[in-house]
Amino acid sequence: VACSLFAQKTPESKQKENIMKSKMFEKETFKKEVVENVKYLYRKTMDEASEQEIFQAVSYVVKDVIIDQWLATQQEFDKADPKIVYYMSMEFLMGRALGNNLINLTVYNEVKEALEEMGINLNELEDQEPDPALGNGGLGRLAACFMESLATLGYPAYGCGIRYHYGMFRQKIENGYQVEEPDNWL
């Protein structure tokens, strides 16, 4: 059972239709879920956990909220049976996910405040997330913009690409020669 970080304000039948408008952030529930994720994922207390482990714990709490909304969206698509756009690109430069997801859930400031109460700086936590190495410039950013536009306009769409195991390569110079190394971004 996924946790809910939001207090219900509408009946269950309306909840999925008005997922963002019908709920309010529950700070104490969020903090409890972060602590529990650190405990169950890493068998540590918050004091023992590294910044990366806390980042992962926070990300899992946010993912639990997003997955519920994603499933609700999929159910609506299944009912409506719309045409779906499949956008294929070799690159998708979506940016870092945690901050974007908090902004899109309209809870960035609330999460920042909750984490501050726990002695955690959200900006420093966001630095724990590497940029996904899914492209190197214009085409990747263009693909991300197309996907954002489709989502904003409410069009059902999927981005299709290649899941790079090592992403883009890192360039290193040894003895005056370029040497490529995999960028293990996952």
Region roles according to the model:
Residues 16-186:
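A conserved ligand/cofactor-binding region detector
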